[in-house]
């Protein structure tokens, strides 16, 4: 795995960034191999950098909890890396606030266990809540600010414990632009009228839904 990462140029990317920016910024770690490689690059650049450990929700992204615990347990072996906390993003278009609430409680519980077991106090929590956006006037999204208000109220319970960063994604930018294209053809099949546009399905489809 390590050789594959280096052959893809991940090490070169880190080296270039560290040479250009020094220890500025925060790096998100997706794997134990990436953590080790980042440490080597930081050592060569003679800098100490801040990192967040991305915890997986069970998909291909991030580290599982056991890997995070192992990294934290052995953190003194990597003095070039300063672990600030954890990062998590599990998906988008969440219609139920209970899902968001349970995820934040889960992350808080993970941080508590890291402190109890290894004396590591997470300073930062970065989380993508996946708040929903209405693309086609779906009534389920009519009260678009209600969940945001619930989230703000929930985070009041944690703001003294962590520096919290929210990844708001499409909730902020979904209405920031429009897609303009031309009509190439209009036809009717079995009584259903279709408009053929000069664009690809990747332009009019959106994550988590079918057109």
Question: What are the roles of these predicted feature ranges?
Answer:
Residues 163-211:
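Charged (often Lys/Glu-rich) extended helix/loop segments that serve as interaction or gating elements
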Residues 96-102, 134-147, 174-185:
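Short glycine/threonine-rich loop-to-helix capping motif typified by GTGT followed
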Residues 1-14:
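Single conserved hydrophobic/aromatic residue that forms the stacking wall/gate
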Residues 23-25, 46-49, 79-84, 118-123, ...:
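Short, well-ordered coil/turn segments that N-cap beta-strands
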Residues 89-91, 125-132, 168-171:
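Glycine-rich beta-strand-to-loop/alpha-helix junction loops that act as flexible
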Residues 30-82, 88:
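Conserved anion-binding
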Residues 19, 53, 86, 127, ...:
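Conserved, mostly hydrophobic/aromatic
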Residues 18-26, 43-48, 188-193:
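Glycine-enriched alpha-helix->loop->beta-strand junction motifs that scaffold or abut catalytic
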């Amino acid at each position: 795995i390590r050789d594959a990462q280096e052959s893809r140029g991940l090490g070169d990317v880190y080296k270039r960034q560290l040479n250009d920016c020094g220890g500025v910024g925060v790096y998100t770690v997706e794997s134990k191999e990436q953590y080790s490689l980042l440490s080597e690059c930081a050592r060569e650049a003679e800098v100490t950098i801040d990192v967040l450990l991305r915890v997986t929700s069970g998909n291909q992204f991030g580290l599982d909890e056991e890997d995070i615990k192992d990294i934290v347990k052995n953190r003194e072996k990597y003095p070039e890396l300063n672990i600030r906390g954890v990062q998590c993003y599990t998906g988008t278009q969440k219609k139920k606030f209970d899902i968001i609430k349970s995820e934040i409680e889960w992350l808080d519980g993970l941080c508590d266990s890291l402190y109890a077991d290894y004396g590591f106090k997470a300073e930062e929590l970065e989380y993508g809540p996946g708040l929903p956006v209405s693309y086609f006037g779906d009534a389920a999204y009519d009260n678009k600010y209600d969940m945001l208000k619930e989230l703000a109220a929930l985070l009041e319970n944690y703001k003294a414990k962590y520096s919290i960063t929210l990844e708001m994604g499409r909730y902020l930018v979904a209405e920031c632009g429009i897609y303009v294209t031309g009509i190439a053809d209009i036809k009717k099949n079995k009584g259903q009228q279709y408009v053929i546009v000069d664009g690809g399905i990747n332009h009019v489809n959106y994550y988590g839904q079918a057109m």
